[in-house]
């Protein structure tokens, strides 16, 4: 399910969500909240407000209404109610609570690209500028830790347009804020930041998303000397572009009226056909990016070379306190073995899909894959 956070509504597909968010009811009312004068409940969304008012049968007294209002405040503030029943007076004390709600996990948001949508996707690939794509990507600090993700369709466009070295630099080296640092030959990755308000309140988080009058005062850096922790955290990236490769490859072969037979004797010929089709449509970078992200040695070697070349660009701001920890970069996926065969969102049925998957697998995994089809 896809949620419109402005209207508190859910939709079965991303296309329906996109259609809804273009409607006047959403665009004109997305920054407005509605408070029911019967029950004092706060409602988001124009349609939700109309439905609530029509169905609400409560009629709270003044004190109950105040309690309901406090309950609403408690969602965003730490509240305390002090009431003097003898004198009929009371006081409400509340203090801001600093919570950050991340976007939904990428794995819960993905749906396979339909053939008719694939045509539109490929058309848009050449339309969007790099500035538009990078702005739409909305990089978060979590793009490093990958416990939660903020990866939009813009990432797929970048993975199709650029080779692996350029893609890695665009995502992690060129952004204004620095997520990597090399100290005494050891690679450190930014893991947490401490922010502060003008009043002096401090809290730790993992995002650069700040409100007005809030500043970053401390950065915590974690060791990743071999870059293997970082590599294992890129599995969501790999899974996303692998499925794009299968969707796009199936669509391109069908568009060229190519049907590959389920015969291992013609593997070499099929590989040449697939490579030529991807080359004709100028999307061979997808194949390279999957190959690099799927190889621990290739990825770590390439990324260390990039960090070395851009070490002068990784200087840290002097107005922030930096703490370098001996702990490894946190990773929920560290040390796990994985295979491209377990990352597909669709069942490989044979023919074109079979050969697309076969030729993207490492040599060592191909015999096992043949036994599963």
UniProtKB/Swiss-Prot annotation:
One of its GO terms (molecular function) is zinc ion binding. Signal peptide: none annotated. The keyword Zinc applies. Keywords: Metal-binding, Zinc, Zinc-finger. A zinc finger (C2H2-type) spans 2-29. Belongs to the IIV-6 302L family. This is Putative zinc finger protein 012R. It comes from Invertebrate iridescent virus 3 (IIV-3). The lineage of its organism: Viruses, Varidnaviria, Bamfordvirae, Nucleocytoviricota, Megaviricetes.
